[in-house]
């Protein structure tokens, strides 16, 4: 089978398409005939050798996938061959950018009916990340106020949609070119990142930080006493404020969380954010897009099967 591989760490130029043997599902795993798989910033970190969880090369890149189960390993009771599924391969976040991939049965779910495989492959990590930030870490409830930093990104787009569905009051900070897009997703107040004055923002119960840096540090000024700043950006330590809590985490994709997302995808209340769609042999181009080459807004997807 064909697979997107690296044999050493480095830039997009280290990516190759190899012919390798089809993997065999282990205990608690399934083998998926991949229809589509995602390409995301954490794939670039793995490629560069900056991931704390990925194995050493040689390895197959990719974590998000959508496809059809081809075989089932031992101790898997909830899935069978022929099931359409989507989700994540494993806790190491590798192996999905291939014609076949093994996946932990605890990190996949039955694919929702409404989205295509390309759309489904764009969802798992980013949508679950948004869900966890809002409802498992910030614990926000209806009518509370939140501030989203980086609301136009892949996670941000889902965070806005999920927050709007829950009835939260949403302030979003984005670049000027993204303001109308984020407003259309459901944000109540959209501010230009070049002009935002954090101390003038109506005090919020939680900040959802997707960009880190100076904006995250300044955002503490906008949080109510007892509120929280939740971040997925670990490039710098979280500031310590006695009156405001802070939390940093890695997303944990599970069947239960994916099933929640699936319900909303099927009823149309959550819309997939698909960007550029490429073929498997264009994986290097996809990683060049991660590095700044022009591409459509949304998650980059590799279309693998029919």
PLM ranges: what are they?
Residues 21-38, 50-92:
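Glycine-rich beta-strand-centered segment in the early N-terminal region that forms part
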Residues 121-192:
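Mid-domain Rossmann-like dinucleotide-binding core that forms the NAD(H)/NADP(H) cofactor-binding site
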Residues 92-104:
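A structural motif shared across PLP-dependent enzymes of the aminotransferase-like
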Residues 171, 184-247:
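Glycine-rich cofactor phosphate-binding loops and adjacent beta1-alpha1 units
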């Amino acid at each position: 089978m064909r697979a997107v591989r690296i044999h050493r760490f480095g830039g997009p130029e280290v990516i190759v398409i190899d012919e390798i043997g089809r993997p065999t599902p282990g205990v608690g795993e399934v083998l998926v005939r991949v229809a589509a798989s995602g390409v995301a910033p954490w794939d670039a970190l793995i490629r560069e050798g900056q991931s704390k969880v990925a194995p050493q090369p040689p390895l197959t890149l990719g974590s998000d996938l959508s496809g059809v189960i081809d075989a089932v390993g031992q101790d898997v009771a909830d899935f069978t061959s022929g099931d359409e599924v989507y989700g994540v391969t494993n806790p190491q976040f590798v192996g999905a950018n291939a014609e076949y991939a093994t996946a932990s049965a605890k990190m996949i779910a039955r694919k929702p009916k409404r989205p295509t495989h390309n759309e489904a492959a764009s969802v798992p990590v980013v949508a679950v990340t948004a869900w966890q930030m809002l409802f498992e870490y910030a614990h926000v409830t209806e009518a509370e106020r939140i501030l989203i930093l980086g609301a136009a990104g892949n996670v941000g787009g889902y965070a806005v949609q999920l927050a709007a569905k829950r009835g939260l009051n949403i302030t979003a900070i984005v670049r000027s070119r993204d303001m109308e897009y984020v407003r259309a997703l459901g944000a109540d107040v959209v501010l230009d990142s070049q002009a935002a004055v954090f101390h003038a923002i109506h005090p919020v119960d939680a900040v959802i930080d997707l960009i880190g840096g100076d904006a995250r540090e300044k955002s503490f000024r906008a949080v109510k006493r007892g509120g929280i700043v939740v971040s997925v950006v670990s490039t710098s330590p979280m500031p310590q404020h006695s009156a405001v809590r802070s939390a940093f985490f890695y997303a944990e994709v599970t069947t239960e969380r994916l099933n929640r997302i699936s319900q909303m995808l099927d009823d149309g209340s959550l819309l997939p954010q698909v960007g550029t769609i490429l073929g498997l042999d264009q994986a290097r181009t996809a990683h060049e897009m991660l590095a700044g080459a022009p591409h459509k807004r949304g998650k980059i997807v590799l279309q693998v099967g029919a």
